[in-house]
A protein has these predicted regions:
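Active-site glycine- and acidic-residue-rich loops that bind
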Residues: 7-11, 45-48, 74-86, 120-128
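Catalytic cores of alpha/beta
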Residues: 12-18, 75-91, 131-132, 154-156
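Core AdoMet radical
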Residues: 1-10, 24-52, 98
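Conserved N-terminal glycine/acidic-rich loop preference
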Residues: 1-8, 37, 50, 59-64, ...
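Conserved strand-turn element in the central/C-terminal portion of the radical SAM core barrel
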Residues: 37, 59-81, 101-106, 113-121, ...
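Acidic (Asp/Glu)-rich catalytic clusters
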Residues: 16-25, 57-61
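Hydrophobic faces of well-ordered beta-strands that scaffold small-molecule active sites
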Residues: 1-3, 26-30, 66-70, 95-99, ...
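Auxiliary Fe-S-binding modules of radical SAM enzymes
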Residues: 90-92, 96, 103-173
Length: 173
């Protein structure tokens, strides 16, 4: 099974429950998003990078497989920030990673910022360039479980290319 949560929602009781449920393979997916505390505050994540590190270590110590989620194109971040996040995530020793482009869903604070011109999502070629810079930094022992966000068509405001998964894979080739 795979269970996803935020680092600040994880405690010893939940880890013990997952570790003790008797399944052969349990993945804990943690929404790390970035290693930058200023960005985590800006996007109202409710946790710090240190809390994320502690959650990863605790989950690994409990014997769980851990997959971290990172986002490219967060408000106020650039490619260097994203790559710093990739390096940071790799250093934590997780077995899996999911990389996501930020997209703008309807009815959110990010949608308001985008509509007012205060946020610009990554262009497709910018995201592909970031992936091309990030993927070689990730050891072959780390399972890449995703390389693009998966928005529902009815919720997506921008960017339109976020619905074209095959296009990103083609661009990477």
């Amino acid at each position: 099974i795979a269970v996803g949560t935020r680092p600040d929602c994880l405690d010893g009781e939940k880890l013990a429950l997952l570790a003790g449920c008797g399944l052969d393979e349990i993945w804990l997916e943690l929404g790390l998003q970035t290693c930058r505390d200023d960005t985590l505050r800006r996007i109202n994540r409710g946790h710090t990078a240190r809390q994320a590190e502690e959650a990863v270590r605790a989950a690994l110590d409990a014997g769980l497989l851990v997959c971290g989620h990172l986002m490219a194109g967060l408000p106020g971040e650039d490619e260097d920030d994203f790559l710093d996040g990739v390096d940071w995530a790799v250093s934590l020793g997780m077995q899996g990673l999911k990389l996501h482009n930020v997209y703008v869903p309807q009815g959110t604070e990010l949608a308001r910022q985008w509509q007012e011109g205060g946020y610009r999502p990554l262009a497709r070629d910018e995201y592909v360039d970031m992936l091309c810079a990030a993927l070689p930094r990730i050891p072959s022992t780390v399972v890449m479980q995703r390389i693009q966000a998966d928005p529902a068509p009815g919720e997506l405001l921008a960017p339109a290319w976020a619905l074209e998964k095959r296009g990103i894979i083609t661009d990477l080739r």
